[in-house]
């Protein structure tokens, strides 16, 4: 099956040492595996939040700090029409959300789904809710097209919204946060 990975990174520095860290590691990427000629492509496979301090983050009333929401285009291309389903995988917290930093999470929303140029709704077959215009995704979720629709090309937007806790921002040195979220084309 075809797989594409989304890497989210950020470097938090204590206020005392807020200076850029050397980048000694290349971003991790996974190859797109495309049997039957299908490809899953992320328009921006790495979402890099750069270097920042806790004072630069927005804090909400629940003592969480939000990083800027970003949108990443997703494209699935197949040589022949087929049923399209995507499975999401990544590091999970105890509540099922994608883990980011120590106790933080990344909200993942799939929206604006189009198949062969036409808008379509999506659903999680394991959820009691019917087809929707957008879905919040967690590791292990599978997304299918409304009425098991078939097509050659799918385009969509993935919104990523990382947040971290008070404990995550209390650091004495630089701390690298990252999460890898994979989108795999599977048979529905």
Residue ranges and their predicted role:
Residues 17-188:
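Mature extracellular/passenger domains of Gram-negative fimbrial/pilin and adhesin proteins
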Residues 1-19:
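Gram-negative bacterial Sec-dependent N-terminal signal peptides
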């Amino acid at each position: 099956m075809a797989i594409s990975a989304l890497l989210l990174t950020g470097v938090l520095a204590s206020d005392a040492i807020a200076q850029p860290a050397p980048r000694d590691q290349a971003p991790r990427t996974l190859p797109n595996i495309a049997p039957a000629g299908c490809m899953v492509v992320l328009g921006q496979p790495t979402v890099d939040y750069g270097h920042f301090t806790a004072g630069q983050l927005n804090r909400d009333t629940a003592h969480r700090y939000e990083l800027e929401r970003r949108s990443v285009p997703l494209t699935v291309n197949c040589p022949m029409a087929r049923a399209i389903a995507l499975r999401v995988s990544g590091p999970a917290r105890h509540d099922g959300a994608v883990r980011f930093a120590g106790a933080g999470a990344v909200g993942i929303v799939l929206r604006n789904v189009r198949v062969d140029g036409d808008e379509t709704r999506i659903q999680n077959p394991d959820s009691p809710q019917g087809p929707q215009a957008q879905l919040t995704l967690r590791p292990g979720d599978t997304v299918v097209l409304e009425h098991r629709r078939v097509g050659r090309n799918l385009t969509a937007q993935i919104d990523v919204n990382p947040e971290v806790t008070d404990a995550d921002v209390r650091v004495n040195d630089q701390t690298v946060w990252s999460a890898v979220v994979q989108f795999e084309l599977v048979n529905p």
